[in-house]
Swiss-Prot record:
Pfam families: FoP_duplication, RRM_1. Keywords: Chaperone, Cytoplasm, mRNA processing, mRNA splicing, mRNA transport, Nucleus, RNA-binding, Transport. Residues 1-79, 183-254 are annotated as: Disordered. The gene is ALYREF. Belongs to the ALYREF family. This is THO complex subunit 4. The lineage of its organism: Eukaryota, Metazoa, Chordata, Craniata, Vertebrata. Residues 103-180 form the RRM domain. PANTHER family: RNA AND EXPORT FACTOR BINDING PROTEIN (PTHR19965), THO COMPLEX SUBUNIT 4 (PTHR19965:SF82). InterPro entries: ALYREF_mRNA_export (IPR051229), FoP_C (IPR025715), Nucleotide-bd_a/b_plait_sf (IPR012677), RBD_domain_sf (IPR035979), RRM_dom (IPR000504). One of its GO terms (cellular component) is nuclear speck.
Length: 254
């Protein structure tokens, strides 16, 4: 401070300028050095961050790549079956729906007094029965036929050989071995034919009766008109002359 007091203003200004320049240079050097030093770690840190962040960045990329390699929601089986088969057959329902096991007999020419209990008692001695029933109509009257279903086909054949042609209550039984396919095809055909016959009868009765009535009415009308014309044409010449004279007389008076 004493030196500056003794110095002139110009010298003080020069000194201040030189000190400022030195301080700036020192700061700049320190700053550069600090930057260099600090930059080294800073850059290293950034570099380390990049290096450390590289795997972080690469991990999502790997995850994306791994996501592409992940299996799809629906994966195709490695080994395909040689022969396609419907899933319905796995449960056994579809396979056994149209095929009926055992033996089934159709007994006909039965007396109308034979009941279900009589049929069951008659055929139960040959084997286990699944069903034995007489066929009845809607009014409850016997149709003279019955179904006898054995669990084993061999038992059904034995019963048919034993009882076919044997009289029951005075009427020989007619026994036939049938299959489920034939029986299912036969029964719907009977129901359709019965319905068709009933409908045809009703149609024929309705339209036929109406046609006859209409024809009768038309015939009556035709006959009435024809009879009237015939009666007019049967007038004699004298009657026609008399009618003409009467008409002329009316015209003259008017």
């Amino acid at each position: 401070m004493a030196d500056k007091m003794d110095m002139s203003l110009d010298d003080i200004i020069k000194l201040n300028r030189s000190q400022r320049g030195a301080s700036r240079g020192g700061r700049g050097g320190r700053g550069r050095g600090g930057t260099a030093r600090g930059g080294g770690p800073g850059r290293g840190g950034v570099g380390g961050g990049r290096a450390g962040g590289g795997p972080v960045r690469n991990r999502p990329v790997m995850a994306r790549g791994g996501g592409r390699n992940r299996p799809a929601p629906y994966s195709r089986p490695k080994q395909l079956p040689e022969k396609w088969q419907h899933d319905l057959f796995d449960s056994g329902f579809g396979a056994g729906a149209g095929v009926e096991t055992g033996g089934k007999l159709l007994v006909s020419n039965l007396d109308f007094g034979v009941s279900d209990a009589d049929i069951q008692e008659l055929f139960a001695e040959f084997g286990t029965l699944k069903k034995a029933a007489v066929h009845y109509d809607r009014s409850g009257r016997s149709l003279g036929t019955a179904d006898v279903h054995f669990e084993r086909k061999a038992d059904a054949l034995k019963a048919m050989k034993q009882y076919n042609g044997v009289p029951l209550d005075g009427r020989p039984m007619n026994i036939q071995l049938v299959t489920s396919q034939i029986d299912t095809q036969r029964r719907p055909a009977q129901s359709v034919n019965r319905g068709g016959m009933t409908r045809n009868r009703g149609v024929l009765g309705g339209f036929g009766g109406g046609g006859n009535r209409r024809g009768t009415r038309g015939g009556n009308r035709g006959r009435g008109r024809g009879a009237g014309r015939t009666s007019k044409q049967q007038l004699s010449a004298e009657e026609l002359d008399a009618q003409l004279d009467a008409y002329n007389a009316r015209m003259d008076t008017s």
